[in-house]
């Protein structure tokens, strides 16, 4: 059991651009009894936040719930017109280029459970996407297996953008396998006309971690819209997922 002495900042660490890795706050997390509360960082007072959390502060860093090193938050940098971020120096590379960091004890640690899907699992997910969204797999679609509740049976996440006729699907699907078939637990499917500019709301799986210490990982996701981005935290309740936090990010 983990107890939070005070509010803890949950950070996202993005090293997809190896020349410009950065760290930015996702949410302020506070645990009150059995309840975990999330609130957005105060982007209106960037200088105060930077003094408190950037400029040489070192944080534990995680990937898929496993501690893998530290992240040193350096000087603030501008990601867009409005943003709250800093350059970051990592003690070791992130396995998937994306990860989390915390300003205090927060994440219930476990080994990384993410793996590639088998040929049969991929085929089953392909059938599910065809049945549920009427789309076909493309090389741009990511499908991974991850054991969110650590019961030895993986869940499956399909994430990407696919054009089907005149419609573009920006989607994220979570499923489980039952007797050789996939069952959906969560579907996000933003549909837009292919010829329409500006209509973007792509939900990207960023990482996973047990934030509320209930034995089941939450999913941390990032929404990319036309002029910026924001964060989502998804929590599983029984056999479905729901968004329990929206906030942070930046844009113009």
Question: What does each of the following model-derived ranges do?
Answer:
Residues 1-9:
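Sec-dependent N-terminal signal peptides
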Residues 9-252:
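Beta-propeller-forming repeat regions
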